[in-house]
């Protein structure tokens, strides 16, 4: 195996600016990133923890010969060895999202939506709740007996859209699959890990129904004299799934229940999300563990604690390791009280 095909550790500061995510909070830098000084940052709504997107590309922290290189360029040099397949397709985009205020009420189209612009695609995603304030929650799907006409009437009146939706109080560990056509919003005080599925060289599309009547200044700060964010009423109405379940029945249909893979005295291994092309496993506890690539690109994201691998290479809270498919097995030692996610991009990871 050539030297450059060892796992790479990514820079942990791939943050969006406040103007892009004006609803952001401060927990990402204060609670979820070891070794980053919160005083250097203000509001941070998103950290793109694994990204090949040119807008916010992941960059390498180590090894030294790849330092600050774009991860996309590193993979492109030997795609078969990194990805484990010949198609060169990586669908995963991984974000950590912290909502200081509620996000807009929105919906994503499917890839089959005829009005998608060139260079864009649908954006199936999922949420794994990692922190929340007391009583905080999400909005997910349409409430009982709500019709398209009800939503249109609320929009016409400039009324609060929340009564048309299901508010779901959350707990740490809750997981939800957000399929195309699902109306949704993350509520204030909720922090989630969000894996998304996007096409290479395309941007996932979000259509906003409503943004809670907010206006913003140029820097992304709330300003009653400012400008509202763009809404996409007609597209949002067109792609919403109006048929099917409502209310609590819909919420439960979107909830993903973890499956225990292995349980040791000091370590729990679970499958916590399955999005088809991408699956997400969780390791919680301490001790030695062989993380297998399953012949596909593998992403390890540390939620808490830390791990050591190789020649004393360390990854701590908020850090990401990307393991090439060809690597086979990463022998890792987890610190006490470590919590990490292992994400597989490809059919072998399911």
Which stretches of residues belong to each language-model region?
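Acidic/His-leaning functional-site neighborhoods
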Residues: 250-319, 326-327
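Short acidic-glycine-tyrosine-enriched beta hairpin
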Residues: 165-177, 310-330
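Loop-centered beta-sheet repeat module
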Residues: 156-214
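Ligand-binding loop in jelly-roll beta-barrel domains
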Residues: 98-102, 111, 121, 132-135, ...
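His/acidic/aromatic-lined binding-pocket segments of jelly-roll/cupin-type domains
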Residues: 94, 103, 125-128, 167-168, ...
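Intrinsically disordered, low-complexity linker/loop segments enriched in Gly/Pro
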Residues: 111, 131-179
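Transition-metal
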Residues: 1-147, 211-254, 280, 348
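Short histidine-centered beta-strand/loop micro-motifs
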Residues: 85-86, 95, 116-119, 288-294, ...
């Amino acid at each position: 195996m050539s030297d450059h095909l060892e796992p790479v550790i990514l820079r942990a500061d791939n943050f969006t600016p406040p103007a892009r995510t004006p609803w952001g909070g401060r927990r990402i830098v204060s609670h979820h990133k070891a070794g980053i000084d919160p005083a250097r940052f203000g509001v941070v709504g998103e950290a793109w923890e694994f990204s090949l997107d040119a807008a916010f590309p992941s960059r390498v922290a180590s090894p030294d010969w790849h330092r600050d290189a774009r991860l996309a360029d590193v993979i492109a040099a030997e795609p078969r060895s990194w990805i484990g397949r010949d198609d060169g397709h990586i669908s995963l985009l991984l974000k950590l999202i912290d909502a200081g205020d509620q996000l807009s009420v929105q919906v994503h189209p499917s890839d089959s939506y005829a009005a998608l612009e060139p260079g864009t695609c649908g954006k199936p995603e999922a949420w794994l709740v990692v922190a929340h304030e007391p009583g905080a929650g999400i909005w997910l799907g349409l409430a009982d007996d709500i019709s398209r006409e009800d939503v249109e009437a609320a929009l016409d009146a400039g009324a609060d859209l929340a009564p048309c939706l299901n508010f779901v109080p959350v707990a740490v560990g809750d997981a939800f699959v957000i399929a195309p056509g699902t109306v949704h919003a993350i509520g204030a005080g909720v922090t989630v890990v969000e894996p998304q599925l996007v096409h290479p060289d395309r941007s996932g599309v979000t259509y906003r129904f409503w943004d809670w009547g907010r206006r913003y200044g140029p820097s992304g700060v709330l300003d009653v004299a400012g400008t509202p964010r763009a809404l996409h009423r007609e597209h949002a109405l067109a792609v919403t799934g109006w048929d099917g379940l409502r209310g609590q029945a819909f919420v439960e249909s979107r909830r993903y229940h973890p499956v225990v893979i292995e349980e040791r005295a000091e370590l729990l291994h679970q499958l916590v999300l399955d999005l088809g092309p991408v699956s997400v496993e969780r390791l919680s506890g301490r001790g030695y563990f062989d993380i297998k690539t399953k012949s596909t690109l593998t992403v390890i994201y540390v939620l808490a604690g830390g791990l050591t691998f190789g020649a004393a290479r360390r990854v701590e809270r908020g850090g990401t390791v990307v393991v090439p498919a060809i690597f086979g097995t990463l022998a890792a030692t987890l610190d006490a009280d470590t919590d990490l996610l292992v994400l597989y991009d490809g059919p072998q990871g399911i």
